[in-house]
């Protein structure tokens, strides 16, 4: 897995040793960033359920101002930190340990406004809905912000989640991307 373009182009990210961490494939990552290209420079991002930090680091490479990387797995957190260091992206990166509810609560308490959320939770029922509820509850999404949810193509997400509506949907094999705003 590598950074596709931008300041960190070509850098190979360290991969997980176990199969519990499921990084976004390069094909899907390329598709995500081709969809959101444009006014996303200087964005503040959250890579929730970050795993390897793949999506957040790609966003930073393409000009995002800051990225919060969040995960509750010790292995993932260590991997994210190593990948951030390898890309020399420490200045623009904040790693937040903990489950997604605590992380979103903490960001809400800080009054953060997020331009891009990357959501790639374990494919379990209810996690997407709860993420959207908390993003709404803490008013975390910036005015022109988007939420990018990666999910199994068989698990159709609702057209409207906590008042956020689907803007675009795409599928790539067994993976689907739903973008909300």
Task: Identify the meaning behind each predicted range.
Residues 1-181:
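Class I S-adenosyl-L-methionine-dependent methyltransferase catalytic core
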């Amino acid at each position: 897995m590598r950074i596709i373009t931008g300041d960190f182009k070509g850098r190979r990210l360290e991969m997980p040793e176990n199969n519990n961490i499921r990084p976004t494939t390069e094909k899907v990552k390329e598709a995500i960033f081709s969809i959101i290209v444009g006014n996303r420079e200087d964005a503040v991002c959250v890579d929730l359920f970050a795993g390897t930090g793949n999506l957040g680091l790609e966003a930073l490479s393409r000009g995002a101002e800051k990225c919060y990387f969040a995960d509750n797995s010790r292995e993932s957190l260590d991997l994210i930190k190593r990948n951030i260091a390898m890309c020399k992206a420490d200045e623009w990166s904040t790693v937040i340990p903990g489950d997604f509810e605590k992380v979103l609560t903490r960001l809400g308490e800080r009054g953060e406004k997020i331009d891009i959320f990357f959501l790639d939770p374990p494919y379990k029922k209810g996690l997407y809905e709860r993420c959207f509820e908390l993003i709404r509850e803490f008013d975390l999404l910036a005015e022109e912000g988007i939420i990018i949810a990666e999910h199994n193509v068989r698990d159709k997400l609702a057209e409207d989640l906590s008042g956020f509506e689907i803007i675009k949907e795409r599928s790539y094999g067994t993976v689907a991307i739903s973008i909300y705003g």
